[in-house]
Amino acid sequence: MTQQYLTVTALTKYLKRKFDADPYLGRVYLTGEISNFRFRANAHQYFSLKDDHAKISAIMFKSAFQKLKFQPKEGMKVMVVGRISLYENSGSYQIYIEHMEPDGVGALYQALAELREKLGKEGLFEGPKQQLPRYPKRIAVVTSPSGAVIRDIITTVKRRYPIAQLVLFPTLVQGEQAADDIVRNIQRADAQSDFDTMIIGRGGGSIEDLWPFNEEKVARAIHAATTPIISSVGHETDVTIADMVADVRAATPTAAAELAVPVLNEELLRISERRSRLEQSFLYLLQQRTERFQRLQNSYVFKQPERLYEGQTIKLDRMTQRLFQAMTTIHHQKQRQAQGIIAQLQQQTPKGQLRESQQQLAFLQRNLQTQMTQLFLNKQKQFTSAVQQLDLLSPLKIMGRGYSYTTKEDRVVKTVTELQPADQLTIHYADGTVQANVETITAKKEEF
């Protein structure tokens, strides 16, 4: 019997007819993960669907792709409806997809990504965050009344900062009603206005379990709250939208409590250390001021007070001397002028000239008297002012405020090195003197 050999084309066409005629392959419901996806604008889409053990090529025509309500991405798990056929040019079978939608968890991830993008554009993630108070008095806890979360928070707060008051707002944290309950309790706690901090959260779980904390309404309630919020949802690797919107994110409930309150003993120790430093600073400042006072007290101003007004006394003497010299000079000048006038009058015999000269002489005498009086008054004012200035600088004024000076044998004592035990001293005050005997002498240490 002679064997009949088929061409590759003939075999491929035969197999294609088999594929197209099979009723089970005419409408296939398939689930898998998108692979090798490269988006092509305004064109047919070519990619693969795979699972853990197999892969199939997929084609989605432009008309079907434009009807999708989501954007397919690499690694997304989807459910598709289509037909299986053979592509003759390559001899491989493939699915022609007519409809596609995210599969289960994949849909949640898709919705989560879209919501993140939306809220991110609105600035809910990057907006200004509220600072947590350092010493909170009341803390609101929005979580389930049962479970490890509330126990961990209570234990941590009592251990670190037992003076803080925890107020639990029992809340559903899983299920269809959870998101509304979370929003309601956030708003209740925030409306009371007497909470310093708010902690919201729950334990770990699947994305479906954590989904209430990915709801848009929860994110907006957190963003609108005026109370600083710490979010602790799931495990450390779980990051929900609530975590991203909250003022602070904590990896665990224990970490949330640690962020909310300080360690009381450490704060008390810090306060004690600061008080000690303050006391030391005060004592150091007091010592500096005391030493400065002692240096001033021992300065020449108090030891030799007459030196304060030596210069002013000399200046006053010079001014007084110039005053008398000026008055004498003016008097002599006017006297000479008067004598000259008298001599001229004596030489003139007419009575009219004599009378006129007498009148002129009287006028000059009055003018001289006025000028001398005015000059004397001016000099007297200058003298009085100088005396007042000297009086302000007088050591008697200083002694009148409680200061004194000491003499030994009518000599001012300037230093303790001039004294010996049993010396007799005279202490001078503003209103009298006191006699004293030296018993002990204590020299001041030198300053370096």
Curated annotation (Swiss-Prot):
It is found in: Cytoplasm. CDD domains: ExoVII_LU_OBF. Its EC number is 3.1.11.6. Its main location: cytoplasm. Pfam families: Exonuc_VII_L, tRNA_anti_2. Keywords: Cytoplasm, Exonuclease, Hydrolase, Nuclease. Disulfide bonds: none annotated. GO terms for cellular component: cytoplasm; exodeoxyribonuclease VII complex. One of its GO terms (biological process) is DNA catabolic process. It catalyses: Exonucleolytic cleavage in either 5'- to 3'- or 3'- to 5'-direction to yield nucleoside 5'-phosphates. The keyword Cytoplasm applies. Signal peptide: none annotated. GO terms for molecular function: exodeoxyribonuclease VII activity; nucleic acid binding. InterPro entries: Exonuc_VII_L, Exonuc_VII_lsu_C, OB-fold_nuc-bd_dom. Belongs to the XseA family. Bidirectionally degrades single-stranded DNA into large acid-insoluble oligonucleotides, which are then degraded further into small acid-soluble oligonucleotides. PANTHER family: EXODEOXYRIBONUCLEASE 7 LARGE SUBUNIT (PTHR30008:SF0). Heterooligomer composed of large and small subunits. This is Exodeoxyribonuclease 7 large subunit. The lineage of its organism: Bacteria, Bacillati, Bacillota, Bacilli, Lactobacillales.
